[in-house]
Amino acid sequence: MQVSVETTQGLERRLTITVPAATVDAAVRKELNGLAKTRRIDGFRPGKAPVAIIKKMFGAMAHARVADEMMQSNFIKAIIENKLSPAGAPTMDPKEIQEGQDFEFTATFEVYPEFEVAGLETIKVEKPVATVKDEDLGNMIDTLRKQHATWSEVDAAAADGMRVTMDFVGSIDGEEFDGGKAEGFNLVLGAGRMIPGFEDAIMGKKAGDEFTIDVTFPADYHAENLKGKAAKFASKLNKVEEQILPELTEEFVKRFGIESGNVEELKAEVRKNMERELAQALKNSVKEQVLNGLVEANQIDLPKAAVAQEIDALRQQALQRFGGFQGGNAPELPAELFQGQAERRVRVGLLLGDVIRTNEIKADEARVNSIIESMATAYEDPKEVIEYYQKNEQMLNGVRNLAVEDQAIDLILSKAQVTEKEVAFDEVINKSGAAA
């Protein structure tokens, strides 16, 4: 076998592989003999038909099979001998097999880029430092109370935090528009559900009031026909309600699985959950900054094939996230939607992979156990979850990969420029939610 390697453009390589005629002819004869023994030929016993007839009947089939086998086996040998790492399946272009002649084919494919991660010491990370304060705990308890609140009708002017029930008809230049009309519409004032100015116009109004709301749709509004348009909403307020928060009674506490009904036990459980959520958010913040710095310090070419594979994976995840689709009912989500995210994933994967290989990072079992225990605390029976992971090798390997990634992040962090900044619990959690 002879091999020549050509760089066509960027990461694309073209191998021209030549297989000696003797090797090809022997493979064709073997294939023809096999076909002669298994195929029925009128007038001849199995395996007794003349070679000329066998070639005439099965020659094309034999050549196709041999060409396929030769391309697959010799391509693998060629990339091993030339130390090439394909980033995707090759495009094969074979010449026709001719008896007594060498068989030549080309294989075109992309390779992974060759690079060494550098610039770790230039990465800047602002490490947020936060704790769950009593005020944060109190706010969370209030949130739980609001989630179980009831509403009571009042004879009062609408104010922030109150719920109103109203009818309205929207128009632009005197003409009603689709989606601009509602009856019995419920709205909690201050929730920010409506376009700017809508809720403000309701403040101070009482049940029975009829009024007009003048607003302008934002320039980036989702409906193309409404962007930047001035509109009027002829409105009537039907009902004003105030929120009634439940007291921290034994009955209320039991709703959250605290069988004793003890308020302090509820607070302890909520604090534990908040601390777990905070720890994850702090970790995510640092990790995101490390990866951003790693990418900025190492600009590398990306194989188009690897990016395309990642786009397909992201597209499938999106379809599953939105409920899944059967057969041909799935919408065609354009690649452009996922291009940036896919490129980042591939780039981060390549860079982190190099850090892991270069530093020979292996999963630390203590770290693996710590990750499992942390995940288990979110379940009712942590012990059962831990045992499940320990008995499931596939799940365990997934956690080991997470541990290796965490260890790589820690290594980069040890070389980076790190400063600490005290921040509030809400700030960390809100940033984490926005990034998700």
Curated annotation (Swiss-Prot):
EC number from the UniProt entry: 5.2.1.8
Principal subcellular localisation of the protein: cytoplasm
Transmembrane segments: none
GO biological process, one term: protein transport
Reactions mediated catalytically: [protein]-peptidylproline (omega=180) = [protein]-peptidylproline (omega=0)
Isomerase found in the keyword field: yes
GO CC annotation, single: cytoplasm
Keywords: Cell cycle, Cell division, Chaperone, Cytoplasm, Isomerase, Rotamase
EC primary class: isomerase
SUPFAM superfamilies xref list: FKBP-like, Triger factor/SurA peptide-binding domain-like, Trigger factor ribosome-binding domain
GO molecular function: peptidyl-prolyl cis-trans isomerase activity; protein folding chaperone; ribosome binding
Family: Belongs to the FKBP-type PPIase family. Tig subfamily.
UniProt domain comment: Consists of 3 domains; the N-terminus binds the ribosome, the middle domain has PPIase activity, while the C-terminus has intrinsic chaperone activity on its own.
Function in brief: Involved in protein export. Acts as a chaperone by maintaining the newly synthesized protein in an open conformation. Functions as a peptidyl-prolyl cis-trans isomerase.
Protein name, as recorded: Trigger factor
